[in-house]
Amino acid sequence: MSSQYFAEEPGAAHRPGLVHVVLSDVHLALDTDSGVFSPGRLDPGTRLLLDVAPPPPASGDVLDLGCGYGALALVLASRAPAARVWGVDINRRAIALCERNAGRAGLANVRCVAVTGTGPADDRLPGRYDLIWSNPPIRIGKPALHALLAGWLTRLAPAAVAYLVVQRNLGSDSLQRWLENSGWSAARYAARAGYRVLEVGR
């Protein structure tokens, strides 16, 4: 797999595509492109998270960490139209797609924000989140992934939780142990076809 999806400015030539997200309650057609995560299909881990995660809070601030072209963020926004949904990613091409897809879907409660580095220090973003969903960029390596999660999980509001989906053979069990050793409550919430959804809280 190309590492370009976690680059700020992907170097791959543009190859526009379309991915359909068809759930029992939400149908979306999302523009994709080369240089972003899973441009040719809805990633199976993302699909698992969409299928099994409990409903988002009806209001408040909700985060899609590593939003890509916006599949998680737009489903969150569709399911919680009164919530403010934030999609963040380091990849500028992905953020442009997320914005375009939110606009085409008429989801005015989505904000797609390009961030730098691993931390959430950005005055455009809220200080606390009532829910975090993420299919995190495992392939950036453990040190960078741990720094990324350590920075963003601390922004969970009291009693809020995060749902992270990780492929088992890419380290879901070791990530769960790291979270627990770092002082977080981390439990396997669901599993399917080699993917694990972890529920993480304080």
Name each model-derived stretch.
Residues 1-24, 34-35, 39:
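N-terminal auxiliary segments of SAM/dcSAM-dependent transferases
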Residues 26-28:
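Well-ordered beta-strand scaffold positions
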Residues 138-140, 167-172:
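Short "lid" loop at the C-terminus of a central beta-strand within the Rossmann-like core
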Residues 146-158:
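A short glycine-rich, Lys/Arg-flanked "PGG" loop and its adjoining helix->strand segment in the class I
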